[in-house]
């Protein structure tokens, strides 16, 4: 392969495009890993909340009537008491319509009922959150997996293209090295590259043009021969028609003898002239001979002088007769000048 500036520009543009694609893919991969880190953090937060809820449930069963000393448990108990107060307000509205009962057992049962309801509500809310986060994380994981697969495929394609470009560049460099070696060898030999290449190109062009001319002339000769053969066939058909017309003229003469009152002009129009057809045939035959002779002479003069003696006569007469003719012709062609030469 020949190394040209256009090829180099194309290779550089391909490498620039591949670098841009690699940068885009690295950005996508970074975003993918960031999303994975975010989802992992969310999962860890959810697990922490679940663990906290489990601890709260365990402690609520053991510490229903005992106040906690730690500030964290106090904060959780405050939240539980606020929720209990709201629930107690709702229950007080309902209890106004009912019968009056002792305050101490009613308060204890309402507190236990409110705690159980609060725990159930908290658990339901946590389960709903967990389901929501699970579905959301599953969708994100699917999207990220598809993006990751697309990114890996694109990276593989880019790597393949890079390998192909590297191979092409290596081959071009090898070609350049071989050309440099050849040029150095030619310079050592003292040959002019420009002159040698120009002469070779000129000779090739001349040979190609001569071949074209020969082919065109042969095609023209074939066409002319075909046209002449077609015309000869037409004239043969016309000659046959004239013979048939002559037989018809004899019949017409007999009819004239039978019908003397018929007009002579009508019969003369039917009988075609005899001499014109033969004259046309002779003219065409002479033209055909002239064309063939001129074509052979042109071919002998411009292309091959031994065409008749080495090809045509061998095919027409045979090798034996041609050798006999050569032996008969040799004494007339050889000049006896040995006596005139100095001894």
Swiss-Prot record:
- Where does the sequence pass through the membrane? 284-304
Q: Which InterPro entries match?
A: SMCO2/5
Coiled-coil residues are 152-238
Out of the domains of life, which is the source?
Answer: Eukaryota
For whether the record's keyword set contains Lipid metabolism, the answer is no
* GO cellular component entries: membrane
| Keyword vocabulary terms for this entry | Coiled coil, Membrane, Transmembrane, Transmembrane helix
Chain spans, region Disordered = 86-108
* Location within or outside the cell: Membrane
Q: How does it sit in the membrane?
A: Single-pass membrane protein
| Statement: the UniProt record of this protein carries the keyword Transcription regulation | no
Compositional bias (Basic and acidic residues) spans? 86-99
Q: What is this protein called?
A: Single-pass membrane and coiled-coil domain-containing protein 2
Which source organism does the UniProt entry give? Answer: Homo sapiens (Human)
List the gene name.
SMCO2
């Amino acid at each position: 392969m020949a190394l040209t500036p256009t090829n180099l520009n194309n290779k550089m543009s391909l490498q620039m495009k591949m670098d841009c694609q690699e940068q885009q893919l690295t950005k996508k991969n970074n975003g993918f890993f960031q999303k994975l880190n975010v989802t992992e953090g969310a999962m860890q937060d959810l697990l922490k909340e679940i663990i906290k809820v489990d601890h709260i449930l365990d402690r609520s069963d053991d510490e229903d009537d005992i106040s906690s000393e730690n500030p964290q448990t106090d904060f959780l108990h405050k939240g539980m008491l606020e929720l209990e107060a709201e629930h107690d307000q709702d229950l007080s509205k309902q209890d106004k319509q009912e019968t009056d009962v002792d305050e101490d057992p009613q308060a204890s049962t309402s507190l236990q009922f409110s705690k159980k309801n609060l725990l159930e509500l908290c658990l339901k809310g946590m389960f709903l959150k967990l389901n929501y986060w699970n579905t959301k994380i599953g969708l994100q994981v699917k999207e990220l997996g598809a993006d990751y697969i697309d990114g890996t495929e694109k990276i593989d394609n880019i790597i393949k293209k890079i390998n192909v470009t590297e191979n092409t560049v290596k081959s071009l460099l090898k070609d350049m090295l071989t050309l440099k070696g050849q040029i150095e060898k030619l310079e050592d030999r003292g040959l002019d590259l420009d002159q040698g290449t120009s002469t070779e190109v000129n000779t090739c062009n001349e040979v190609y043009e001569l071949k074209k001319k020969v082919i065109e002339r042969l095609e023209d000769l074939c066409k002319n021969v075909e046209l002449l053969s077609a015309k000869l066939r037409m004239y043969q058909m016309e000659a046959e028609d004239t013979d048939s017309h002559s037989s018809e003229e004899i019949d017409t003469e007999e009819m004239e003898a039978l019908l003397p009152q018929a007009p002579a002009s009508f019969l003369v129009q039917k009988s075609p002239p005899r001499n014109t057809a033969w004259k046309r045939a002779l003219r065409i035959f002479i033209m055909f001979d002239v064309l063939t002779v001129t074509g052979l002479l042109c071919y002998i003069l411009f292309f091959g002088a031994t065409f008749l003696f080495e090809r045509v006569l061998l095919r027409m007469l045979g090798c034996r007769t041609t050798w006999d003719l050569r032996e008969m012709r040799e004494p007339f062609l050889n000049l006896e000048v040995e006596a005139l030469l100095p001894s």
